[in-house]
Every structure is written in C-alpha cells, then in structure tokens.
A protein has these predicted regions:
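Secondary-structure transition/turn motif
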Residues: 22-28, 58-68, 81-82, 119-122
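Hydrophobic residues embedded in beta-strands of well-ordered beta-sheets
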Residues: 18-19, 55-57, 113-115, 496
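Generic recognition of long tandem-repeat/solenoid scaffolds
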Residues: 2-6, 21, 52-60, 78
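A low-complexity, Ser/Thr/Gly/Pro-enriched, surface-exposed linker/loop concept
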Residues: 12-54
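Short, well-ordered beta-strand segments enriched in hydrophobic/aromatic residues
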Residues: 11, 19-21, 61-64, 496-499
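Extracellular/luminal recognition modules and glycoprotein regions
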Residues: 1-8, 14-16, 26, 31-33, ...
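Catalytic-domain carbohydrate-binding cleft regions of carbohydrate-active enzymes
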Residues: 64, 75-506
Length: 506
C-alpha cells in the first residue's frame, strides 16, 4: 500500500477509492487486521500515484489538505476538483449507511474502538490475556470511501474492506419451521413427517431452548426426558433432508467478558460438542435475564455474540472437513432492531454474520408493515438475510392476515414462520383450513421456483455487497417516487414485490 506520513498523521492509500487517515498513538501506527476492518491484507499490493506539496496531497481528481497542526486530524479536508467534499470530524463507528438517494461523495468510517484480532480467531489458546485480542479505545483512525454519490459503489467498497456476509447454504433459502415449543424426539419427528404428507418442502427446523436440561435456558446438557437420544434424532432429521438449528440463550461464565480465556474455552467446547453429534446451526438469542459481556462499550454483546458463534462454528467445520468445509450458518438479532422496532445498525461488523432476525414481533397488520420496512432498511445496510418471525411471534392472525404474512415471508430473504407456545394456531401452512393451506403452498412453490434467482443474487451479494432484496431507491436513486417507497422492494433487478399491508389496498 502507498502511504505518506505527515507528523503524527499517516495517509494510507488502500486504493484510489479507499483512503485511511490515521493519527498515531504513542508514536505507533496500526497495520494489523482489526475487528471492524478485517481485510487490510487484500490491499497490500495496491499502488496509487500522488504528488505532495507543503499544504497537501493531490491524486487523480482529489486533493487532501493537511491540517495546520501535524499532531491532530482536526482541520484535515478533502477537495474534489477544487470543491470541499469532506472535513474531518470525530465520529463513532456505525453500520448505518446513508440511504441510496442520499449517498455522499465521501463516506467516513471510524475504526474505534480498534480491536486487533489474534491470528487464530475466536479459539481457546491457553491463559493468554484477553485471549490475544488487543483493544484500543478512542483512537482516531478513519477510512474514507470516495464513492462519488454512487450507492452501489459505496456498498462494494464497504464490504470489501469490512468483510462480506458469508454465502449461506442453499438450504437456508428454502422452507423453515420455527417455534418456541417444547418438542420431544417423537413430536419433532412427527412434524417432519407431517410436512412430507402435506407435500410441503422443509429444509430447516428450529428446536428452541427446551432442547437443554436446565430450566433457565442455560447450559449445554441435552434434556434426555424430551430427547432420549439426540444423536439419533439428528440422524433421523438428516435422513429426511432436514437441517436442525438449536436456540441458545447464553449466560456469561462467572461474569467474564467474551474475550476472557475461561469464557472462550467454555463457549467453544460446548458449542462444538453439539456440532460434533450432528447439529447443523446455532441460533444465538438474547437471554431473558442476562447476556454475554462485551469488553468495550463500543461494541454490543449482540455483535460479539454473532462473531463468536460464527467463528466457533467455522473453526469446527474447517477442522472436520478440511479445505472444502461446510459453510457456517448462524442466526442472531439484528443490531439494532428490537422486537420489530428499527433503531439503527450500530456497528460495521454485524453485517458479516449470515441470518439475522428482527426479534419477537406481533402478528398484527402494523407489525407486518414494519417488517417490510425493516427488510428494506436492513438490506440497504448490507444485511442480506434479514428475516421476521413470519406470522408473528405472538398472537393469532386471522386467515387473510396469516396468508399476507406467508406471502411476504416467501418473498423475503429467509422464509421462517415462527410463533410462541401460547398461540391458538401454529404457523404451519395447514394450521387454518384447506383453502388457506392451498394458497400458502402456491407461494411456497413460487419461492422454490425463484430459488435460482435468489441464490444468484445471494452470490452477487457475497461478491459486491449488493442486496438480494433491495429498495426501489437502490436501482432508481434519482426517482423520488422510487426512493421514498417503504412498502415495495425488488428481487434482483427485475422482479417488483408489492406486499399488501398497512393502508395499501388491492
């Protein structure tokens, strides 16, 4: 990489479109990959030509103006063809990208807190301080994306530097069954067979927290009263073409943060213990009474949880399978959408971790409307596999509303019907009557016909960060009617989806 040092400031050219502006701390600069910026090594051999004079650096159409004080970034600016397009200001890390129609000429991303990640990732390596992670708070280290008001370019640059979302297994894009319910080995098997009798495809089944022995939803010992032989059940599910995901509400080990060796050891051993008997995926859920402990205020426990569950799963599959290992799949909360209420995307790391859901929502029409908006907002922020508790975690929708939910679910990134154990009707297609079942089955069949298109766009997302399902404004950012719509979206570039919800009428 090309760089220039001006006093305590390093200007680092990762490419002609990504510039790093770093203020040294104690006379040192940071060259290691970090939690927020894991892909520095991709830019090692990039060369950018520039000229330097007393007041700044000129490269291409741009000029970086030095601050008068060589020891601070305050006063640094960037000009494009003589016009100022960026002035440095202190900012927090965020994963909230500007809406496509409001993409700036320059987008700034802070790598603070800066967390240097050990080479072995999230894996126990003995009693090493913070398991080899090094946290540096309040650094001034900013990456500038010269995206020139191009929303697609910004997202491609963003995921190239901050990390792509893993391309999920094809099964994840198929049909799910998910419910907070105390299944037994027998009833879970009966449900799988019922899908077969109704000629409805099922690819993933969630066994919620009652799979475990502890009543508080903690620990990793299997509830032998419900599942006398868990390995036998997992083999049975696989023989029917169904992958199994366990829900986990983790508790910290003796108050330890996620980087402390005893926490890393406990989590790694136990998550991998169940993967070893045939479990396919983990659902990292918020705990009702406690949560994992973040070692820094700058990164939430939701994001660190996504990270550690992903890394532990990936490490296990890599050791088991070798170079062509099974792609890891995890599910966790969108950070930060709380029980269907969108707040913001709090950091630039959480988008990397595959399936993310919007929390325990309700079943009413307003909730459906919000979930459509959540899909659009999250997709615009490089979270491609956002999904809802389709049909509502709580409540009993009428038949028409149930159908609307299922139609939306089949035309969204992940089709995961879900509810709790208090509802009168489950979320299976046959839960109401034959007419309702037939309609839902038609839309499930439509989803499977669309799978080649969905998967093609999933690969495109992996390569360049373009959403699978995207806002109208993403493709038509200069059309005010398009970018103002929060109730319609597209699959790829050619299929318009307009769910009937809220005030919309047929």
């Amino acid at each position: 990489m090309t760089q220039y040092i001006y006093g305590d400031i390093r200007i680092h050219f990762f490419s002609e479109e990504i510039i790093r502006i770093e203020q040294s701390k104690d006379g040192r600069f940071c060259d290691e990959n970090t939690f927020f910026v894991p892909n520095k090594s991709n830019y090692l051999h990039t060369k950018v030509g520039f000229t330097v004079d007393e007041t700044g650096i000129t490269f291409g159409k741009y000029r970086i103006r030095f601050p008068k004080n060589r020891r601070t970034l305050l006063g640094l600016s960037i000009e494009k063809e003589g016009k100022t397009v960026y002035r440095y200001k202190k900012l927090a890390n965020t994963g909230e990208l500007p809406p496509p129609a409001k993409t700036p000429c320059v987008f700034a991303l802070s790598d603070s807190p800066r967390i240097v990640v050990p080479d072995n990732g999230y894996s126990y390596c003995g009693n090493i301080n913070s398991s080899g992670y090094v946290i540096d708070e309040c650094v001034r280290d900013v990456y500038l994306f010269l995206c020139e008001k191009d929303a697609k370019k910004l997202r491609k640059l963003f995921v190239g530097l901050t990390g792509q979302n893993e391309l999920v297994r094809l099964s994840v894009l198929g049909g799910w069954n998910s419910r907070y319910y105390a299944y037994t080995e027998e009833t879970a098997g009966q449900l799988i067979e019922k899908y077969e009798r109704h000629d409805i495809p099922l690819d993933v089944m969630v066994i919620d927290t009652d799979w475990r022995k502890c009543k508080n939803g903690w620990g990793y010992d299997v509830n032998r009263k419900l599942f006398p032989d868990m390995e036998r059940f997992l083999d049975y599910a696989h023989s029917h073409g169904v992958e199994i995901m366990f829900n986990d509400h983790p508790e910290p080990v003796d108050g330890a943060s996620v980087f402390e060796p005893r926490e890393v050891k406990y989590r790694e051993e136990n998550l991998q213990k169940l993967l070893n008997i045939g479990l396919d995926a983990w659902w990292y859920d918020r705990n009702w009474t406690t949560c994992l402990i973040s070692p820094t205020k700058g990164v939430s426990c939701e994001t660190f949880g996504l990270y550690l569950y992903y890394d532990i799963t990936k490490n296990y599959f890599s050791k088991r399978d070798g170079e062509n290992f099974t792609r890891p799949v995890i599910m966790g909360n969108v950070n930060d959408v709380f029980n269907g209420q969108y707040r913001s995307i709090k950091d630039s790391a959480s988008h990397r971790y595959s399936v993310q859901w919007t929390g325990d929502n309700l079943c009413d029409l307003d909730s459906l409307t919000r979930e459509i908006e959540n899909l659009i907002k999250c997709s615009d922020n490089c979270i491609p596999y956002v999904n809802s508790d389709c049909g509502g975690h709580r409540g009993d929708p009428g038949k028409e509303l149930f159908v609307r939910w299922m139609q939306f679910g089949t035309l969204s990134p992940v089709f995961r019907p879900h509810c709790d154990d208090q509802v009168k009707c489950g979320r299976e297609p046959w839960a109401y009557d034959r007419e309702t079942e037939d309609i839902v089955k038609e839309y499930i069949a439509l989803r499977y016909r669309l799978l080649p298109i969905i998967y093609k766009n999933a690969f495109n997302n992996y390569v360049c960060g373009e959403p699978i399902f995207k806002s109208l404004g993403y493709e038509y950012s200069t059309d005010k009617k398009a970018w103002s719509r929060t109730d319609e979206y597209m699959l790829g570039n050619d299929i318009l989806i307009a769910p009937i919800a809220g005030n919309k009428r047929e």
